[in-house]
Amino acid sequence: MFSYLQKIGKALMVPVAVLPAAAIMLGIGYWIDPSGWGANSQLAAFLIKAGAAILDNMPILFAVGVAYGLSKDKDGAAALAGLVAFEIVTTLLSTGAVSQIMGIPQEEVHAAFGKINNQFIGILCGVISGELYNKFHKIELPKFLAFFSGKRFVPIITSVVMIIVSFILTYIWPAIFGALVTFGTSIAKLGPIGAGIYGFLNRLLIPVGLHHAVNSVFWFNVAGINDIGRFWGAPEMAYADLPEILQGTYHVGMYQAGFFPIMMFGLLGACLAFIQTSKPENRNKIVSIMVAAGFTSFLTGV
């Protein structure tokens, strides 16, 4: 069980690794045009939109990246299966689809289905499709169906399985969503103490790699917190749709302390300190190690 959780944790690193790229593009864009946020500069607008494209589509990236990361041979067919799984679930469980399938007005559809496009669902789709790939990517079908044998069969079986999963989620997703919201808001409403608890949980789960699952609740719009999105959004809109229970206790960026700002800049200072204080006879070795480590930390957050 422990080794499998570590495997999922490693797979989660694939989509998480793109976050620094988004941060760099957004940061440079806002630096170029700090007042207009892209309105006064085509280059700034280009960079801001490019960075936002990554953040806005993190659920899809989780589905594709986790499926790819879990596949035994890191094949693109697994990534395609992850995308297929995500599209099926988010389409079947959208507010309009649930309204039509259940025969009820959209106003009566549970609010949880309006938040089906989130990182939790992306991770779930990625895990399921990745495991389906590992099980079926070498399957041999009868000769008249031979074209669909092997890896081509994976997206097909994924489609069937995700229809069943969607049916199950129709009844349990509101409860799961409610639990995620309760978990996130219960910690977030504690203010700085809650941020400390979140940091503790994050460090506690690092050995199995599941700290990324906890991060998704606070960094993205799973439970309404969306710390990264609020930080990079327009200042006047930072608290616009904040859950009422968090008013006065949440501050934008409080769940980024110790993370990407430190990974991208603080650790570079630490690397420089190592170089400056190294013995002359070892300096060349230390420089090569620290430059590689600092470069990796800045670009990937690892």
Label the predicted regions:
Residues 36, 89-100, 157, 190-197, ...:
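Juxtamembrane membrane-interface segments at transmembrane alpha-helix termini
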Residues 53-58, 116-120, 150-156, 187-197, ...:
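Membrane-interfacial loop-to-helix junctions in multi-pass transporters
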Residues 96-107, 196-202, 235-237:
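A cytosolic-side transmembrane-helix exit/cap motif
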Residues 221-254:
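Interfacial juxtamembrane loops and adjacent helix segments
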Residues 58, 242-302:
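Alpha-helical membrane segments and immediately flanking helix-loop junctions
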Residues 128-144, 160, 168-180, 212-216, ...:
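Juxtamembrane interface elements at the cytosolic ends of transmembrane helices
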Residues 2-143, 147-148:
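Early transmembrane hairpin of solute transport permeases
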